């Protein structure tokens, strides 16, 4: 039974939800807007690794992308926009077969949001009703149960589809399982996590397991509705603690108004939509269990081998995949970048960032397959 009734949930969403720089029908963020003082990147790294603070309690200032960064993003778009449009269409076609309407897309902030908006449009264009929310899930702390229960109170649980951009090591999938694996509403079938690229081999549905340059993976808020990653300064509410009185206590985020002139969230969606609408008929996305398992085995072997080779006790210091490796350079204190190929077009931005940050690079060939890039975070404390 829902914690609040449908009318109360609708009222709460309309009152407290927002859409950032997206159109209101494209996504509703179930996050509370906040302001906290930014933490210097090096100090944040020290606090994380010392255990003094969890990463979700702090955030560093997000700077405007440089002209070179935007130039490399445009190259990524030229390379990948056709593939992205095709894979969005393939995923949407599978979703309309698998779920009854309306499909309730629940994207994980931030990486899932651009894909969620694209899927929203593709599902609508297939003639099916769809709604889209952006909520928080935090490694080690779980999904935002208050936000999720608000959605369930309004729409039920049967047609919920969780959306993320890709899987790196599979940490968010593990967090989803830990949060909802014993929830009777979701028992009996795999948790429906949809991603573009399931490199870690742990998603319910993916367009591929390739580590490729997903354009939305190499920008931050300026392609995700001008919001920060989610923030949770205090203790998180567990599933059992949600009541009608605290169901509005969603995780938080910052709106980055200072980056408004650089925001391309809408242009990105429009551009991919225009390509998608001109596509030839596409086959439905299929992510076979055998394919998924092979991917999972290979990716786990790489992570475990690197942990041994570089004496890494905390595997959160290993950031595999082009997208994760790039984000780690921008947001963390990198120690080393491992590349599969020295001249890979898809790692051009990553290589540019290593030059700026003076991060060492090693080309290691197929040792890191299926990944094409991995960033190792600098060790500042234990492990």
UniProtKB/Swiss-Prot annotation:
Keywords: Autocatalytic cleavage, Hydrolase, Protease, Thiol protease. Is probably processed via an autocatalytic removal of a proregion of about 100 amino acids. Disruption phenotype: Deletion of this gene causes hypersensitivity to tellurite, altered population dynamics during long term batch culture, and, most strikingly, dramatic alteration of normal cell morphology. Induction: Highly induced by starvation during long-term stationary phase, while shows very low expression during exponential growth. Its EC number is 3.4.22.-. InterPro entries: PELOTA_dom, StiP-like, StiP_N. GO terms for biological process: cell morphogenesis; protein autoprocessing. Belongs to the cysteine protease StiP family. This is Cysteine protease StiP. It comes from Acinetobacter baylyi (strain ATCC 33305 / BD413 / ADP1). The lineage of its organism: Bacteria, Pseudomonadati, Pseudomonadota, Gammaproteobacteria, Moraxellales.
């Amino acid at each position: 039974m829902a914690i609040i009734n449908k009318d109360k949930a609708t009222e709460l969403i309309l009152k407290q939800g927002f859409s950032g720089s997206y159109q209101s029908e494209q996504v509703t963020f179930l996050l509370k807007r906040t302001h906290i003082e930014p933490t210097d990147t090096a100090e944040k790294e020290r606090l994380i690794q010392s255990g003094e603070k969890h990463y979700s309690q702090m955030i560093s200032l997000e700077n405007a992308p440089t002209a070179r960064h935007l130039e490399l993003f445009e190259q990524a778009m030229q390379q990948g926009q056709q593939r992205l449009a095709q894979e969005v269409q393939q995923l949407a076609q599978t979703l309309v077969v698998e779920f009854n309407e309306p499909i309730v897309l629940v994207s994980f902030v931030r990486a899932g949001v651009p894909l969620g908006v694209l899927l929203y449009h593709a599902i609508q264009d297939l003639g099916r009703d769809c709604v889209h929310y952006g909520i928080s899930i935090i490694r080690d702390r779980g999904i935002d149960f208050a936000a999720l229960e608000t959605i369930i109170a309004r729409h039920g649980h049967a047609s919920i589809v969780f959306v993320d951009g890709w899987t790196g090591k599979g940490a968010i999938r593990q967090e989803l399982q830990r949060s909802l694996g014993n929830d009777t509403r979701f028992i009996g079938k795999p948790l429906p996590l949809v991603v573009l690229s399931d490199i870690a081999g742990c998603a319910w549905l993916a367009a591929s397991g390739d580590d490729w340059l997903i354009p939305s993976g190499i920008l931050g808020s300026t392609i995700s509705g001008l919001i920060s990653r989610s923030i949770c300064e205090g203790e998180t509410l567990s599933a059992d603690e949600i009541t009608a009185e605290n169901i509005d206590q969603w995780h938080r985020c910052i709106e980055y108004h200072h980056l408004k002139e650089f925001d391309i969230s809408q242009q990105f969606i429009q551009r991919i939509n225009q390509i998608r609408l001109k596509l030839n008929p596409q086959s439905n996305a299929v992510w076979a269990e055998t394919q998924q398992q092979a991917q999972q085995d290979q990716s786990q072997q790489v992570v475990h081998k690197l942990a041994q080779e570089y004496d890494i006790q905390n595997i959160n210091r290993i950031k595999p995949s082009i997208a994760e490796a790039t984000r780690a350079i921008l947001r963390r204190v990198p120690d080393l970048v491992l590349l599969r190929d020295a001249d890979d077009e898809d790692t051009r931005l990553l290589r540019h960032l290593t030059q700026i940050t003076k991060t060492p690079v090693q080309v290691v060939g197929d040792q890191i397959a299926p990944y094409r890039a991995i960033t190792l975070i600098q060790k500042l404390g234990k492990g």
